[in-house]
């Protein structure tokens, strides 16, 4: 891998000499095994020209067996129809696809997009959240587009093994032009049991909060969080003229 995309991404440069999908990846262990977790994979897709490509984050258990994968793929070399796929694997390695979301048509004509894919497991409930940005028109990532969420229940508890290892992987299809897809980041968090009566922490020290009045969006660390806003539902419909935003507690946030 080499640093690419204006110093933000990491690009695969050497691919195996084989047929079909060929790729390169890097793997590392987590500081500790995680029972409940939230894992987000962030990638950039160069889709100005047509081509086939895929990139994914793989999650392994303590025995090194594949537990889950979250990834983005454009499998048709002559079309720009990408989709996000989440797959779980049982102890035997049998795959179970629980999410397959195809880009909305508004994404087809964009030259460069940033894709976020999040998989969260708490108990036997898996939550998936995906969103994207137009990296050309919105380089600061203030206006999330093509957002989607889904929940899936592991009724048989076949996918409850602790997560211990992660890997980032990028691939192209041998014989066809590569639609370049590069990883931008992997964010892996253990979810600890919440004490009784405790509230979820939405904003923490160091978080970057962006409120866009024109786009009517609230983004925290590039994640759409409008559903978590505590201000009135008519906040974005204030008449033109003087308005004031009050942030509490005072002297805490750097604005």
Question: Where are the language model's segments positioned?
Answer:
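Secretory/extracellular carbohydrate-interaction modules
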Residues: 1-95
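Ligand-recognition surfaces built from glycine- and aromatic
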Residues: 1-22, 32, 47, 145-216, ...
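Extracellular/lumenal carbohydrate-interaction signature centered on repeated Trp-anchored short motifs
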Residues: 27-39, 105-113, 237
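Carbohydrate-binding surfaces in secreted/extracellular proteins
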Residues: 39-41, 107-156, 217-220
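Surface-exposed loop/edge segments in extracytoplasmic proteins
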Residues: 65-69, 95-97, 135-149, 225-227
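Broad, structure-driven detector of short, well-ordered beta-strand segments within folded domains
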Residues: 66-81, 115-121, 164-169, 209-212
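Short, aromatic/His-centered strand-loop micro-motif at the edge of beta-sheets
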Residues: 84-118
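C-terminal interaction-tip segments
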Residues: 251-255
């Amino acid at each position: 891998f080499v640093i690419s995309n204006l110093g933000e991404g990491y690009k695969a440069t050497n691919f195996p000499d084989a047929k079909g999908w060929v790729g390169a990846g890097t793997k590392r262990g987590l500081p500790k095994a995680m029972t409940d977790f939230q894992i987000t994979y962030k990638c950039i897709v160069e889709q100005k020209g047509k081509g086939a490509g895929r990139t994914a984050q793989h999650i392994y258990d303590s025995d090194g067996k594949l537990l889950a994968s979250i990834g983005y793929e454009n499998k048709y070399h002559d079309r720009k129809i990408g989709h996000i796929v989440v797959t779980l694997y049982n102890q035997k390695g049998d795959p179970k696809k629980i999410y397959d979301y195809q880009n909305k048509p508004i994404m087809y004509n964009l030259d460069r997009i940033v894709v976020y894919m999040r998989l969260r497991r708490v108990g036997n409930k898996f939550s998936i959240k995906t969103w994207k940005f137009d990296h050309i028109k919105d380089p600061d990532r203030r206006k999330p587009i093509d957002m989607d969420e889904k929940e899936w229940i592991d009724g048989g508890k076949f996918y409850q093994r602790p997560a211990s290892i992660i890997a980032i992987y990028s691939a192209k299809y041998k014989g066809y032009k590569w639609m370049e897809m590069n990883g931008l980041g992997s964010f892996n968090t253990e979810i600890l049991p919440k004490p009784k009566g405790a509230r979820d922490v939405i904003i923490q020290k160091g978080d970057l909060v962006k409120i866009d009045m024109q786009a009517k969006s609230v983004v925290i660390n590039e994640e759409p969080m409008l559903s978590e806003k505590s201000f009135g539902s008519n906040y974005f419909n204030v008449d033109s003229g003087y308005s004031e935003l009050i942030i509490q507690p005072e002297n805490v946030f750097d604005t």
